[in-house]
Amino acid sequence: MAFCLGFIMNVRAAAASALYQVVDLGHSLSNALPAAQQQIRPRDHALLQEICYGVLRQLPRLESISQALMGKPLKGKQRVFHFLILVGLYQLSFMRIPAHAAVGETVEGAQDLKGPRLRGLINAVLRNYQRDQEGLDAQATSHDAGRYGHPGWLLKLLKESYPEQWQQIVEANNSKAPMWLRVNHQHHTRAEYQALLEQAGIVTTPHAQAEDALCLETPCDVHQLPGFAEGWVSVQDAAAQLALTYLAPQAGELILDCCAAPGGKTAHILERTPESQVVAIDCDETRLKRVRENLQRLELTAQVICGDARYPQQWWQGEQFDRILLDAPCSATGVIRRHPDIKWLRRADDIAALAELQREILDAMWQQLKPGGSLVYATCSITPQENRLQVKAFLERTPDARLVGSDPAQPGRQILPGEEAMDGFYYAVLSKQH
């Protein structure tokens, strides 16, 4: 739904509009949320995000409660009001907002969504929930989808893939993600920057393996971070920062960052090895704009190319690379805590299609690697089909490929969501024999 510029919208209405776009129209939350933020006061941005993330984390439970209270769901042009009801239910169930304010503000949201006649219905639904909250909550969490907040196909996949750990994964997926920083080694050591943060009253914890990573005790606005505008620090999860550890770039090498957007790993390579030549490719010109913006803020230089990794003949300049970082397109099932819309935008059959795309890119990139060079295969997924099984199949069909640093029976390192406070990620290091 679109609204005129200059109109200050009720936060609950803006949240309902964004949720409608994500769940019903299939838009990503990363697109829907900024559009909704433009309709509200800046001071309400955090509340909007909390509501949208929360509803998406608890969607099956809230849908179940709504169905029990209403019988027939709202349809057609009234669908956005269905999401307004979910917004109200989420506040009453999970937020510390006083009940009268949560109900009153949500009911008023109907006015901004051009549905004043539905205020009575929304008020009645929310009041009825308050009267029997315990019973309705128990009913809504009596089935797995409502209890765990995940679609059936994903729960099944997690249970099959991780029979001992699936509940911890689900819990991590439904939790708030911590804020990790990557200290720019060109300006400060991690210890030096941690001291600067401490002087600013910001408490952090270093990561044991990711050498430049600091975890904030309490997330904050990036503009509160010392030297952010000057490029002293960036926001990047510790798991993503491990790409540098596994890639181990050396000065003077020609390095390819494949599927590079939004450019965090490209920047990290250059921060640590400014003497290296880095080529960053991605097939999405819009997302490459982010790469260029990040490099500009950090005062780093890379060759940024828009190209399809499956068809290097269209963009490759003829010289093989010493190292390749292939952060492959994936299901993103390792970063659900940061992008809860993934649970509802992904479908079970996406996994096989993505695995086939990854296979094509991996085979194409292998031809661009020098003999003696190494390729790091990475995803922010936790599905075996995209990770361990993908690498196993690659090794079986590629005679000059060798796995580095892990057991061929269980190739690579699978990081699960929440492990050492990190996102879910996968890494495998492959060397090319002479």
Curated annotation (Swiss-Prot):
Q: What is its EC number?
A: 2.1.1.176
* Reaction catalysed by this enzyme: cytidine(967) in 16S rRNA + S-adenosyl-L-methionine = 5-methylcytidine(967) in 16S rRNA + S-adenosyl-L-homocysteine + H(+)
What are the GO cellular component annotations? cytosol
Q: Which CDD domains match?
A: AdoMet_MTases (cd02440), Methyltransferase_Sun (cd00620)
Ordered alphabetically, the record's keywords are: Cytoplasm, Methyltransferase, Ribosome biogenesis, RNA-binding, rRNA processing, S-adenosyl-L-methionine, Transferase
Q: What domain of life?
A: Bacteria
A molecular function (GO) held by this record is:
RNA binding
* InterPro entries named among the record's database cross-references: MeTrfase_RsmB-F_NOP2_cat (IPR049560), MeTrfase_RsmB-F_NOP2_dom (IPR001678), NusB-like_sf (IPR035926), NusB_RsmB_TIM44 (IPR006027), RCMT (IPR023267), rRNA_ssu_MeTfrase_B (IPR004573), RsmB-like_ferredoxin (IPR054728), RsmB-like_N (IPR048019)
**Where in or outside the cell?**
Cytoplasm
State the Gene Ontology BP annotations. Answer: regulation of DNA-templated transcription; rRNA base methylation
User: Main localisation, per the record?
Assistant: cytoplasm
Cite the binding residues for S-adenosyl-L-methionine: C259, A260, A261, P262, G263, G264, K265, D282, D308, D327
Instruction: Cite the active-site annotation.
Output: C380
State the similarity comment: Belongs to the class I-like SAM-binding methyltransferase superfamily. RsmB/NOP family.
Functional note: Specifically methylates the cytosine at position 967 (m5C967) of 16S rRNA.
User: What protein does this entry describe?
Assistant: Ribosomal RNA small subunit methyltransferase B
